[in-house]
């Protein structure tokens, strides 16, 4: 299993790729993989894809509809139990296990902010080291920090 950051940094994956986490990152990676001819499979614990706040409704709706149109397998209310060689084992909300064959697994299950330094005078945290967000929240945070300087 590799992290989303590793994939985005260029790490190769197989033909059929299980994506653990159907938030914005996982959904965008699935979209990119499908556009390049790979076969993504999304596994999401929540009852919907891209359920976090602050995401443009047009973007999230487009991705949901595109996955349905392209018949991208999406397992909602499903959690990862085990990663095996050539497959993953998941459980749905009733506890029923399902084995999903795949060549690679990408973890997109979320991140925790991790500043590289402590808060000091004239130090402003922006971006994911303050709070994991999206491009809009990063730009707004940087603007607000710049206005304080």
PLM features per residue range, with description:
Residues 7, 61-63, 70, 87-89, ...:
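Short, well-ordered helical secondary-structure segments
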Residues 3-54, 92-104, 108-149:
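Rossmann-like dinucleotide/flavin-binding elements
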Residues 4, 55-81, 147-149:
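N-terminal glycine-rich dinucleotide-binding loop that anchors FAD/FMN and/or NAD(P) in oxidoreductases
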């Amino acid at each position: 299993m590799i992290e989303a950051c590793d994939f985005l940094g260029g790490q190769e994956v197989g033909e059929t790729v299980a994506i653990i986490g159907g938030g914005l990152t996982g959904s965008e990676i699935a979209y990119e993989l499908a556009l390049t001819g790979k076969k993504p499979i999304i596994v999401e614990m929540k009852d919907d894809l891209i359920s976090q706040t602050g995401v443009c409704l047009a973007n999230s709706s487009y991705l949901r509809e595109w996955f349905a149109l392209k018949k991208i397998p999406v397992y909602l209310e499903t959690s990862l139990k085990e990663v095996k060689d050539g497959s993953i084992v998941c459980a749905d909300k009733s506890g029923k296990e399902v084995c999903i064959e795949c060549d690679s697994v990408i973890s997109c299950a979320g991140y925790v902010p991790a500043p590289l330094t402590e808060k000091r005078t004239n130090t402003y945290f922006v971006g994911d080291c303050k709070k994991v967000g999206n491009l809009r929240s990063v730009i707004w945070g940087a603007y607000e920090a710049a206005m304080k300087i």
